């Protein structure tokens, strides 16, 4: 799951055997399979699953991307389905060239339709208008976007995926220079159901889908390709489903 280049895996297996494949590591240019979240609709249940505390991050309504900065300075943007979309978001490429510190890096974030003049998030349908192969310049004018970053998986030769979440978050904060179109996701440490409910309400008020509640314990490594209980989504539609049943 840390290397999606089947050709590289195959050639490594032929030349070095299974032991060599097991030594493959995260590196820019080879997309990492995204860590995924479970979902629940009750704050107390979420906290119980996460050991009583968590980081409640805003769940933005946009396109999740994995951004790779290569050694030559090139920026690649990949979707969670391993589709490269760099040419569709040249403005995101530029803000990363300007605001990302490490010379080589892999980070994850959400590309969101965003009005910097009013500091307002726009609906998901607007950012999807950017998913085109033609008319890119006009699309950038019609639908400006921002990148809200939530993970740093690699920086200047160091694989960060095995670090606990709080350490990755701190490294991410140090790796970017925030600006109008490049920011960290909003996150709040919570330890009580009422506080988690309040964070959820604020996220919705601010135009987000809800929260991604992340374990901040010592074993909160980035689990590439896994849908485990280290991350749990709390979204408006989940609560609506609960109230309707």
Each model region followed by its residue ranges:
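Short, charged low-complexity intrinsically disordered segments located at boundaries
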Residues: 14, 121-127, 197-208, 229-235
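Flexible, glycine/threonine-enriched loop-and-boundary segments that flank and lead into catalytic domains
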Residues: 35-56, 60, 193-199, 215-245
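Electropositive nucleic-acid-contacting surfaces
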Residues: 2-7, 84-85, 90-94, 200, ...
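N-terminal nucleic-acid-engaging modules of covalent nucleotidyltransferase systems
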Residues: 1-192
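Metal-assisted phosphate- and nucleotidyl-transfer catalytic regions
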Residues: 174-224
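A short, structural micro-pattern
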Residues: 103-106, 141-146, 205-207, 226-228, ...
């Amino acid at each position: 799951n840390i290397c999606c280049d089947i050709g590289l895996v195959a050639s490594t297996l032929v030349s070095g055997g299974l032991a060599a494949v097991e030594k493959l590591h995260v590196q820019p240019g080879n997309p990492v399979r995204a860590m995924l979240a479970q979902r629940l609709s009750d704050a107390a249940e979420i906290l119980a699953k996460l050991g009583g505390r968590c980081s409640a991050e805003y769940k933005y309504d946009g396109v999740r991307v994995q951004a790779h900065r290569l050694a030559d300075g090139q920026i690649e943007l990949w979707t969670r389905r391993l589709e490269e979309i760099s040419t569709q978001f040249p403005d995101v490429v530029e803000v990363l060239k300007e605001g990302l510190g490490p010379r080589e890096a892999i980070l994850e974030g959400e590309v969101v339709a965003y009005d910097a003049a009013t500091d307002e998030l726009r609906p998901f349908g607007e950012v999807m208008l950017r998913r085109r192969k033609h008319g890119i310049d006009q699309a950038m004018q019609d639908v400006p976007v921002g990148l809200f970053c939530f993970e740093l998986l690699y920086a200047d030769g160091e694989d960060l995926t095995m670090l606990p979440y709080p350490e990755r978050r701190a490294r991410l904060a140090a790796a970017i220079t925030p600006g109008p179109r490049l920011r960290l996701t909003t996150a709040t440490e919570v330890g009580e159901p009422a506080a988690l409910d309040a964070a959820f309400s604020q996220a919705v008020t601010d135009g987000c889908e809800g929260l991604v509640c992340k374990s901040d314990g010592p074993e909160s490594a980035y689990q590439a390709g896994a849908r485990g209980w280290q991350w749990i989504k709390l979204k408006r539609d989940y609560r609506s489903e609960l109230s309707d049943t």
